Amino acid sequence: MTTKVTIQDIANELQLSRNTVSKAINNTGVLADATREKILRKAAEMGYKQFAYLPLFQEDAAKTAAPSILPSDKREIAMLTTQFLSSSHFSSTMLDRFQSEINHLHSGMTIHRISPIELKEKKLPSSLNIQRTAGIICFEVFDYDYAQMLCDLDLPLLFVDSPVMNMRPPLKADRLYMENRIEIQNAVTHMVQRGKKRISFAGDKNHCQSFFERYMAYRDAVEHFGLTEGLSTCAMPSGQQNYPVSLYETIHRFKTMPDAFVCANDFVAMDLVKALNELGYSVPDDIWVCGFDDSQEASYFAPRLTSIHIHGQIMGYTAANLLMTRIEEPSLNYRTVYTETNLILRESTGD
C-alpha cells in the first residue's frame, strides 16, 4: 500500500516548518520565490496528492510545451465574470494555475466583465471577439437564462460554479465545483460533538449552486442529528444590495439565538460576526461561526475564522483539463466534477 505523503513529511525533508510548507502549497502568505519553488519541487518529487500527477516543473518550458490543439486564428480562451475578482477570492490562485496550463498549449486568456445591462439583455461583453475564441470559462455567472444563452453559442464552455440547478434542465456545458457537502457535514458534526444543539445557516442559498449545496448539506446534517430547531433561525436574506445590513436586520429579529452558525462563505461569516458583535454577542464565547473558502482574510480576522479550504491549484488544473479536452473532443458527454475541500478549525469555533 502506498504511504500518503503529508505536509509534515515535506517539512521534515526540507527542515522547514509545517506552516511554511502549507503556505507554499496553498499559495497563501508571503514567501520568497526560491523557498516556494523549492517546496513545490519537493512536493511533486515526493508525490504529494495535490502535485503528484501535475507537470509543475518542466525544464525549458518553451521547448517541452505540448503542441497547440487550437487553430492559429482561434487561440483565445475567454474568461467571463459578472464581478471583479479580488486577490482573496479562491479564483485568484485557480486562474494563475489555469493560465499556466493553457500557456503550455500556446493559448492565451482574455478576461471580460459582463455588465449589468449585458446580463439583463443577455448580450456578450462588447470586448469579446467571438471569432477568435476557442472556449469560454465562466466565474460568478449565476443567472440561469444568461448561462443558457452562453450554452446556445455552441462553443466549448465551462462553468466554475453555476446558477442553482435544482428543478431546472441541465446546462449543456461542463461544470466544475469545489466539494460542498462533506466538510459542511463534518463541521456540523464537530459542533454537535462539542455540545452545540441549535445550529443555523447564514447566507443566500439561492445565490449559486455551491451555496445551495452547502445549505442542503447543513440541513441534512442537523436532521441526521435530530437538531432541527436551528432551521427556524437561519439567516438567509437574498440579494447582494446592502447585504451586511440585511443580515444584521435578520438576526436582530431572532427571539432566540443559535449556538452556532454555518455560513455560505467567509465573507458572510465575517459580516455575521460583526453583526453579532453589534448585538452584544461574542464569537466564540457566545456563538460559534464557521465560514467556507478559507480566504486570506480568514486567518487574520478577529477571531481567526474556522473555514473550509478550497484547493485553488487543483481547481485550476482541472478547469484547464476539462476545457481543453472539450475543445479537442466536442462530442464528449457533459461532465460535472468536484474537487476536494478540507475543514480548517480556528478560533471562531473555540479551536
For each of these PLM feature ranges, what is it?
Residues 48-124:
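Amphipathic helical "hinge" segments at domain boundaries
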Residues 102-115, 201, 219-244:
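Short beta-strand elements in bilobed, periplasmic/extracellular small-molecule ligand-binding domains
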Residues 89-105, 183-186, 209-229, 271, ...:
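Short, solvent-exposed amphipathic alpha-helices that sit
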Residues 185-227, 335-350:
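An alpha-beta-alpha
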Residues 174-202, 241-249, 269, 310-328:
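Hydrophobic alpha-helical segments within soluble ligand-binding/sensing domains
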Residues 248-351:
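Flexible loop/turn connectors
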Residues 139-183, 267, 293-305:
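Flexible loop/hinge segments that line or gate small-molecule binding clefts
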Residues 1-65:
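N-terminal helix-turn-helix DNA-binding module of bacterial transcription factors
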